[in-house]
Amino acid sequence: LEIQAIADDITSKYVPPHVNIFYCLGGITLTSFLVQVATGSAMTFYYRPTVTEAFASVQYLMTEVNFGWLIRSIHRWSASMMVLMMILHVFRVYLTGGFKKPRELTWVTGVILGVLTVSFGVTGYSLPWDQIGYWAVKIVTGVPEAIPVIGSPLVELLRGSVSVGQSTLTRFYSLHTFILPLLTAVFMPMHFLMIRKQGIPGPL
């Protein structure tokens, strides 16, 4: 392996003079995601994804586990930071024309990552299975009901049954801890490699 050549390529990449702090928003979003991976992994040691034990396990994490309150708080703060930085990043890219040719596919992968980020928020919000989480899930999963023909089957697919319950929590837990992180781990490198290949767009 030509490790030195790879290291030189990474460390000697030309940075255009117009690049400022606003071009770091995507990197901050990535950092927030990595913090959530670390803290989320720690919380899985204590969280129990059942409707009878989920809330109690979160309470146990917050009150009994050493630094459990800090781990969960950092997870929540970094989640909010990730959403905020992603929104600002989208505005910066749009205002600087970073979505235009030849960077259309970079924009597409970014939009997919945006959808995944929102999905993280929706699924994670339900996991404590408190009153707020329960009713949020009920409302969100009920939205597709308005779609003609496929609305009802889609709602049942999201919930795992006709009503919100254990099947719903299991689905959301699986999405939040396995499927969404896996998809993000696929699209993030694609997004960064495209940026690396095509470079940073010019100034306004």
UniProtKB/Swiss-Prot annotation:
Cofactor requirements of the protein: heme b; heme c
Residue ranges the record marks as coiled coil: none
Pfam assignment, any one: Cytochrome_B
HAMAP family documented for this protein: Cytb6_f_cytb6
Purpose: Component of the cytochrome b6-f complex, which mediates electron transfer between photosystem II (PSII) and photosystem I (PSI), cyclic electron flow around PSI, and state transitions.
Miscellaneous comment as given in the Swiss-Prot or TrEMBL entry: Heme 1 (or BH or b566) is high-potential and absorbs at about 566 nm, and heme 2 (or BL or b562) is low-potential and absorbs at about 562 nm.
Full protein name: Cytochrome b6
